[in-house]
UniProtKB/Swiss-Prot annotation:
Database matches in Gene3D superfamilies: 1.20.5.2210
Species per Swiss-Prot/TrEMBL record: Pongo abelii
Gene: ATP5PB
Highest taxon listed in the record's lineage: Eukaryota
GO CC term (a single one): mitochondrial inner membrane
InterPro entries, A to Z: ATP_synth_Bsub_B/MI25 (IPR008688), ATP_synth_F0_suB (IPR013837)
Name under which the protein is recorded: ATP synthase peripheral stalk subunit b, mitochondrial
Source taxonomy: Eukaryota, Metazoa, Chordata, Craniata, Vertebrata
Subunit structure: Component of the ATP synthase complex composed at least of ATP5F1A/subunit alpha, ATP5F1B/subunit beta, ATP5MC1/subunit c (homooctomer), MT-ATP6/subunit a, MT-ATP8/subunit 8, ATP5ME/subunit e, ATP5MF/subunit f, ATP5MG/subunit g, ATP5MK/subunit k, ATP5MJ/subunit j, ATP5F1C/subunit gamma, ATP5F1D/subunit delta, ATP5F1E/subunit epsilon, ATP5PF/subunit F6, ATP5PB/subunit b, ATP5PD/subunit d, ATP5PO/subunit OSCP.
Stored SUPFAM superfamilies: ATP synthase B chain-like (SSF161060)
N6-succinyllysine modifications at: K131
Function according to Swiss-Prot or TrEMBL: Subunit b, of the mitochondrial membrane ATP synthase complex (F(1)F(0) ATP synthase or Complex V) that produces ATP from ADP in the presence of a proton gradient across the membrane which is generated by electron transport complexes of the respiratory chain. ATP synthase complex consist of a soluble F(1) head domain - the catalytic core - and a membrane F(1) domain - the membrane proton channel. These two domains are linked by a central stalk rotating inside the F(1) region and a stationary peripheral stalk.
Primary location class: mitochondrion
Family to which this protein belongs: Belongs to the eukaryotic ATPase B chain family.
Alphabetically ordered keywords of this record: Acetylation, CF(0), Hydrogen ion transport, Ion transport, Membrane, Mitochondrion, Mitochondrion inner membrane, Transit peptide, Transport
Amino acid sequence: MLSRVVLSAAATAASSLKNAAFLGPGVLQATRTFHTGQPHLAPVPPLPEYGGKVRYGLIPEEFFQFLYPKTGVTGPYVLGTGLILYALSKEIYVISAETFTALSLIGVMVYGIKKYGPAVADFADKLNEQKLAQLEEAKQTSIQQIQNAIDMEKSQQALVQKRHYLFDVQRNNIAMALEVTYRERLYRVYKEVKNRLDYHIYVQNMMRQKEQEHMVNWVEKHVVQSISTQQEKETIAKCIADLKLLAKKAQAQPVM
């Protein structure tokens, strides 16, 4: 895994140096501007969670798989041993005191990795799981908030779609209020006209009654004035005679 990182970093550095022009000591001119390209709409493949397999902590497994069809199972080891012996025989690499120091350091590092590596890996995995759990919780919270916002928006859209019912209700209420006002005013006019007609009828009845009383009084007055004293005496005498006759008839009838 470490070799892949080193090789990729070296390839990136080489390509950047190849495409750059020297302006001065320690100064490079960039030939392209970063973060200005058009975004790709294709789906980005997910990054691997774990790295590829390596042998001896440095050599990728793909190197052995590449040489197996051509050299067999022992081919990569023979090739590596031959390269080491070639470098030593041609004095490309000379063994010195630093070589033993490097071997000692490498041995200590390998021992530390073998002994404490799993515990450190478990601790790192726990930290990673905690971070993933926090991110997942934040993601679920965000999804829930967005879902709530979507539900609220849908409810608001439903209310907006049904607002014409509110307009119809308000229109009907206004029509009913106008109808009630119209009927109240019509009843007020009816009462006013009825009161005026009743007043005129009362006035007419009063005038007719007064006219009748005046006529009766006038006739009675003239009748009384037309009766003489002799006629009055005769009438009184006739009334007394009639009363006496009625009294005799009443006495002649047996009492039941």
